From Swiss-Prot:
Protein name according to UniProt: Urease accessory protein UreF 2
One GO molecular-function entry: nickel cation binding
Family the entry assigns: Belongs to the UreF family.
Function comment: Required for maturation of urease via the functional incorporation of the urease nickel metallocenter.
Domain of life: Bacteria
Statement: the UniProt record of this protein carries the keyword Lyase: no
Record carries keyword Heme: no
Key words of the record: Chaperone, Cytoplasm, Nickel insertion
Pfam family, one: UreF
InterPro entries, per database record: UreF, UreF_sf
Length: 243
C-alpha cells in the first residue's frame, strides 16, 4: 500500500484557510449577539395568515426569502465588500443608503439598521480594524443608516473572508433565522427544518453566480407579499417577534 505524504505547501494552504472558515462559522452563527433572534423575516405574519402552515409551505417560504435576499441584501453585501477592500468610504455610504431606501416598510428598516449597528459595534470591539471603527462613528453620528449587509461586508473584509463566502454566510443567516423562528411558531420538527436547511444551502452557489458581478443599481427587492405581511404585523395584537 502506498502512503501519500502531504507536502509543506499543502499543510500551509490548509492552515491559511482554517481561520477564514472559523470566522465564517462565528459570524454566520444565528447565536451571534446582534439581535437576529428577535426577527422572523415575515414568518410570524405568514403563519398567522395561514400562508405557512406545514413543512412544505415553510420550505417554499424559506427558499423565496433567500432568493429575495440574494438580489437585494446579497448584492449590497458584495458591493460593500468590494468598496471596503478599496477603502472607498463614499461608495459605502451610497450603498448603505440604497439598502435602507429599498426597505419599504418600517419593520424591515428597523431590522436592518438594528442588526447592522449591533454587528458594527461587535466588529469594532473585537476586530483590530480602523474602517470598522470609523464606520461605527458614522452610524453614531447619523451620517449613514448602518444597514446589516454593509456592516457584514466590512466585518468580513477585516477578517480577510472573500466575497463568495461572505455571501454564503449571509444566505445561511436568512435561512436559519426563518427556520429557527418556525420551531417556536408552528408544529414542525428539528428533522423537518434541517432537511429544509440542507436543500436551501444547495441553492446558494447558483445564486452567487447570478449576482457575483452585479452593481448596486442591480439591487431588486420586489416582494409585495413580504411588505403586506409586514404591514399586517405592525398592527398585530399578539407578537412574539419584532418583524
Amino acid at each position: 500500500m502506498t502512503m501519500r505524504t502531504a507536502t509543506i505547501t499543502e499543510f500551509s494552504s490548509s492552515y491559511r484557510s482554517l481561520p477564514g472558515l472559523l470566522h465564517l462559522l462565528q459570524f454566520g452563527d444565528s447565536a451571534l449577539p446582534i439581535g437576529g433572534f428577535s426577527f422572523s423575516n415575515g414568518l410570524e405574519s405568514a403563519i398567522q395568515q395561514n400562508l405557512v402552515h406545514d413543512k412544505e409551505t415553510l420550505r417554499e417560504f424559506t427558499l423565496t426569502a433567500m432568493n429575495q435576499a440574494a438580489t437585494s441584501d446579497g448584492i449590497a453585501l458584495l458591493t460593500a465588500h468590494r468598496a471596503a477592500r478599496a477603502d472607498d468610504r463614499g461608495a459605502l455610504q451610497v450603498i448603505d443608503k440604497a439598502v435602507f431606501e429599498r426597505k419599504l416598510n418600517e419593520e424591515t428598516r428597523l431590522m436592518t439598521v438594528r442588526m447592522g449597528r449591533k454587528l458594527c459595534e461587535l466588529s469594532a470591539s473585537i476586530i483590530d480594524d480602523r474602517l470598522n471603527r470609523d464606520w461605527l462613528e458614522c452610524i453614531k453620528t447619523a451620517e449613514t443608516p448602518g444597514t446589516h449587509p454593509v456592516s457584514l461586508g466590512l466585518a468580513f473584509v477585516a477578517l480577510d473572508v472573500d466575497g463568495r463566502d461572505a455571501f454564503g454566510a449571509q444566505q445561511y443567516g436568512v435561512a436559519t433565522t426563518i427556520l429557527g423562528a418556525a420551531l417556536r411558531l408552528m408544529r414542525v420538527s428539528f428533522m423537518d427544518t434541517q432537511k429544509i436547511l440542507l436543500e436551501a444551502t444547495s441553492t446558494v452557489a447558483p445564486a452567487y453566480e447570478e449576482i457575483a458581478d452585479a452593481g448596486i443599481e442591480d439591487m431588486a427587492s420586489f416582494a409585495p407579499m413580504v411588505d403586506i405581511l409586514a404591514a399586517v404585523h405592525v398592527k398585530g395584537h399578539v407578537r412574539m417577534f419584532m418583524n
